[in-house]
Amino acid sequence: MDNKSNGKLIALAIGGAVLMGTLFFLVSFLTGYSPAPNHSAILTPLRSFMGWFLLIFCASLIIMGLGKMSGAISDKWFLSFPLSIFVIVMVMFFSLRFYWEKGRTTTVDGKYIRSVEQLNDFLNKPAATSDLPPVPADFDFAAAEKLTDAKCNKCHTLGSVADLFRTKYKKTGQVKLIVKRMQGFPGANISDDEVIEIGTWLQEKF
């Protein structure tokens, strides 16, 4: 395969990637696409376009490379073939690694989360607001824990809903709201004072 044919294949890969990316870019507006409030209406779909471009272009290069290798197998194929695959995979890995340096999860204050450690740190930070009163200095956490275990583990254990509780209610300062919902279930037998006691323990210790 000569250099002219190689140029045509590369041009075809780039042209196909641009065409597909443009198609998805336009369809995103036709389907009523609404970008995130902290991104512009053009920048967000443009990032999606770049993702599709890299995906299709790298896939085209892989197909071209495998085709060339299949036509040039020699007595050294056992060495060239795995090395070529390794190089292709590493190029894709580092291109995606360095291009998407900001991560995929964005907090409301514009920061990015890239790792599990960063996610855990974010979830463990106290909420900015709370629907519970301040914790009294003489609050009995041991008694509140026993009360919570007795009242809040009837239908299911707290551990089974821990992630949902921490992300949807505790992180948004709505612990009292979820305890009030539990109070409304038949047979809950949770008084208004116990709502505060249970909510305080969940907010501070769970």
Swiss-Prot record:
The chain crosses the membrane at residues 10-30, 49-69, 76-96. GO terms for cellular component: plasma membrane. It comes from the Bacteria. GO terms for biological process: photosynthesis. Keywords: Cell inner membrane, Cell membrane, Electron transport, Heme, Iron, Membrane, Metal-binding, Photosynthesis, Reaction center, Transmembrane, Transmembrane helix, Transport. Its main location: membrane. It is a multi-pass membrane protein. Coiled coil: none annotated. Component of the photosynthetic reaction center. The reaction center interacts with the Fenna-Matthews-Olson (FMO, fmoA) complex. This is Photosynthetic reaction center cytochrome c-551. It comes from Chlorobaculum parvum (strain DSM 263 / NCIMB 8327) (Chlorobium vibrioforme subsp. thiosulfatophilum).
